[in-house]
Design a protein with these regions (language model features):
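Histidine-anchored nucleotide/phosphate-binding helix
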Residues: 18-32, 38
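Short amphipathic alpha-helical segments and helix-helix/interface helices
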Residues: 26, 63-67, 106-107
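Short, active-site-adjacent cap segments at secondary-structure transitions
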Residues: 45-48, 85-86
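A glycine-rich helix N-cap at a beta->alpha junction
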Residues: 54-82
Length: 119
């Protein structure tokens, strides 16, 4: 089993499919039996907030998919220092207080993983 780390940095629903494809890849890797970790930082932290709503013109609920991945064993951490200053919903709580991370955690994850991908 390989260890994969996906680092997401972009605002969800920003007109690109960065977050969408990252979450799809995480799910595909997990389904193959790989060990998957996701770290959200910068504006991507909004993916971990219940206040982030799927736009009407978007066919995929990114927050729901992230919750599903996490519930199915994908390790998840969200930048702690980004909480108050990043995203459209800066300062609003993450959907799970246990997912709050740090740069030290990210550094450990990078060092431990076989492959790191950024989106």
């Amino acid at each position: 089993m390989k260890k994969f780390l996906l680092i997401l940095t972009n605002q969800p629903y920003n007109g690109t499919d960065n977050a969408y494809n990252a979450l799809r890849l995480a799910g595909a890797l997990k389904n193959r039996g790989e060990y998957v970790r996701i770290f959200l930082m910068n504006d991507a932290v909004d993916l971990a907030r219940n206040s982030t709503q799927k736009p009407e013109n978007y066919d995929f609920d990114l927050v729901a998919k992230l919750k599903e991945l996490h519930a199915n064993g994908v390790a998840l951490k969200v930048c702690g220092s980004c909480d108050a200053r990043c995203g459209l919903h800066a300062g609003e709580p993450y959907f799970d207080s246990e997912i709050k991370g740090s740069m030290d955690i990210l550094a450990s994850w990078v060092a431990e993983c076989d492959q790191v991908m950024t989106f």
